[in-house]
């Protein structure tokens, strides 16, 4: 849930929790919890590399931004350099195990 950490740091840096002029770049599709935090922070655009059919919450699973309870929907660009993102994630977790 690196998105949560980044949003917290950005809020400290910019002096507020509304990050309306900010874009977020991540390697993996955010989960539903992180998608909710992205929405609450009013992130302008979300870019992610690899889709996550198992735990994703943007284009997979609950599709948080498509729910009627979602009050802010960032522009979403998924699948950016997906193969490279997937490879980076696999290599990262191989080292961790």
Give the role of each language-model region.
Residues 16-28:
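Immediate flanking context of iron-sulfur cluster ligation sites
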């Amino acid at each position: 849930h690196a998105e949560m950490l980044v949003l917290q740091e950005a809020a400290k840096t910019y002096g507020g929790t509304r990050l309306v002029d900010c874009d977020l770049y991540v390697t993996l599709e955010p989960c539903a919890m992180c998608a909710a935090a992205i929405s609450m922070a009013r992130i302008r655009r979300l870019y992610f590399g690899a889709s996550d059919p198992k735990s994703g919450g943007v284009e997979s699973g609950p599709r948080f931004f498509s729910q009627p309870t979602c009050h802010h929907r960032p522009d979403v660009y998924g699948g950016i350099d997906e193969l490279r993102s997937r490879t980076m994630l696999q290599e990262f977790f191989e080292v961790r195990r």
